[in-house]
Amino acid sequence: MVDRWYNIAADLPSVLAPPRDPDEGESRIGLLSKILPSALIDQEFTAERWVSIPEEVREAYRRVGRPTPLFRAEGLEKALGTGVRIYYKYEGVLPVGSHKLNTALAQAYYAKADGAVEVATETGAGQWGMAVSLAAALFGLRAVVFMTRSSYNSKRQRLTFMRAYGAVVYPSPSDVTEAGRRHYRPDHPGSLGIAISEAVEYVLSGERRKYLPGSVMEFVLLHQTVIGLEAVRQLPEEPDVAVACVGGGSNFAGFTYPMIGMKLRGEGFGRTRFVAVESEAAPKLTRGEYKYDFPDAVGVLPMLKMYTLGHDYVPPAIHAAGLRYHGAAPSLSLLRKLGIVEAVAYPQEEVMRAALLFARTEGIVPAPESAHAIKAAVDLAKKLPRGSVIAFNLSGHGLLDSDAYEKFLG
């Protein structure tokens, strides 16, 4: 069992640009102390390479099934016939079916330690909402979730399970908050940016409430490194390419940052390329601009230096709702800017075809988000020399995404 998280800030070639307040209005940086557990603020700004995992969180990790397995994709390899070896780390074995639980448990623990009785958050496809709902229940907290309206209407199974774990779930934009009312109309698909604004406003409107972000913040990426730290121990050989999908960046960071850190320190993974895979519906790393922008739609949170499509960008409704986000985490954005991380974007149809190939060769129906990594792995396997090695993170299963598969299959 991993006993510490890895912080890539200690090994970055350039100093990470700090959060910044806008030129006008009240301080957003000062707001963080009102909405986040104090330990998470410390983790957001620390330059220490290693952060100890509290025993209570480690025990929670054990209870939910960490460490998660790493498999060789022999069926997929055979179907492709390229002579490339493919490995995948599988986070779908966790109770909520995705990697999101890794940071949800940590954040809920720190919220409880700060005296909170209620937590609020945003969710797209529902993986993060489910993770927060379960983590809150395990640590004796109430949970409120603002779910993008397109997913609220289509991902009904995840909505049901959030409620089963005890959460109150609102479709976003909602009429519960001013941020929601500003965008509200019945046919609005919502966006993660709007949902973040609603969750933050909700936390500020009551007592003993804390906000739990699902991605983008550096402490979220920190917690997810349990994935990559386990994978480094499990991989029988170093990959030529490591791949993961990107919404805000926590999944990609969780899988690759321990490897990137070793590469930057000269301790291994010297030949490994790192490929971030995004949806063409939200192509921040491939078509976005590197600048300071708000991580939420209304501008409640501090500005972050990141690749962004603009905080007012509303992506179209897609099957991979968890990738419908306008920006990428600051550390990931910096790595992309420096050329250490590559990026590629795919259209939905190609991704879903790769998902079906994986289901029929490996037996796991992947989440549409995770299928982006599969699509990239398949394409890479067709281009790399025989004997090459690919490793990717399968961040979740798609058993609660039957709506997406039903629509695609017709």
Curated annotation (Swiss-Prot):
The gene is trpB. Its EC number is 4.2.1.20. It is an enzyme of class 4 (lyase). Tetramer of two alpha and two beta chains. Keywords: Amino-acid biosynthesis, Aromatic amino acid biosynthesis, Lyase, Pyridoxal phosphate, Tryptophan biosynthesis. The beta subunit is responsible for the synthesis of L-tryptophan from indole and L-serine. This is Tryptophan synthase beta chain. Belongs to the TrpB family. The modification N6-(pyridoxal phosphate)lysine is found at K100. One of its GO terms (biological process) is L-tryptophan biosynthetic process. SUPFAM superfamilies: Tryptophan synthase beta subunit-like PLP-dependent enzymes. PANTHER family: TRYPTOPHAN SYNTHASE (PTHR48077:SF6), TRYPTOPHAN SYNTHASE-RELATED (PTHR48077). Its cofactor is pyridoxal 5'-phosphate. It catalyses: (1S,2R)-1-C-(indol-3-yl)glycerol 3-phosphate + L-serine = D-glyceraldehyde 3-phosphate + L-tryptophan + H2O. GO terms for molecular function: L-serine hydro-lyase (adding indole, L-tryptophan-forming) activity; pyridoxal phosphate binding; tryptophan synthase activity. The keyword Amino-acid biosynthesis applies. The lineage of its organism: Archaea, Thermoproteota, Thermoprotei, Thermoproteales, Thermoproteaceae. Pathway: Amino-acid biosynthesis; L-tryptophan biosynthesis; L-tryptophan from chorismate: step 5/5.
